[in-house]
Amino acid sequence: HDALPIWKLYISEIPEQEIIMQEQFSTKELKKFATQIRMEICKMIATIPAGHLGGSLSIADCLAVLYGGRLKHNPEDPKWDERDWLVMSKGHRGPALYPTLALRGFFPVEMLATINKPGTDLPSHCDRNHTPGIDMTTGSLGQGAGTACGVALGLKIDGRQNKVFLIFGDGEIQEGQV
């Protein structure tokens, strides 16, 4: 019979909440995850009259790597104090982040069909007050870098080990704030 992966040998010593964070996808699993993200992006964009398909598709690999084991997160507790932060500065790339969060269990995948519809929790731009797993409300380009630095500094001052990841676009560099 197959040997247990080394991390499973220590599973009884790790609190259940920590196990969620330690899952690491293999390269094959990351490719599959990125493909699933892209498929869900295409389905979502097809249901709304507008959207940034190219930009959303272009960050699927990055999101797959982050949510496939690099970024500490807990879908059952999206505001978990020990989580790492993701600042999606280019908020119009929400159609990439939403499927990523849904596929990781932050909310049901069926909810993706409600993007940008009245009363939805999935507005066209990321909104931390509506969508589980969103760390920063975005809209205006160029503000994410400063916000990410501020969050990282605040965490450091508090003596916390959380990491802060930033995704921003080339157009933001032209905004004069980066």
Regions found by a protein language model. Give the residues of each.
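N-terminal hydrophobic or amphipathic helices/low-complexity stretches enriched
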Residues: 21-37
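Short, small-residue-biased leader/transition segments that mark boundaries at the very start
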Residues: 1-4
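N-terminal capping segment at the start of a domain
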Residues: 34-50
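Intrinsic disorder/low-complexity segments
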Residues: 16-19
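Cofactor-binding active-site loop characterized by glycine-rich and histidine/acidic residues
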Residues: 41-44, 56-178
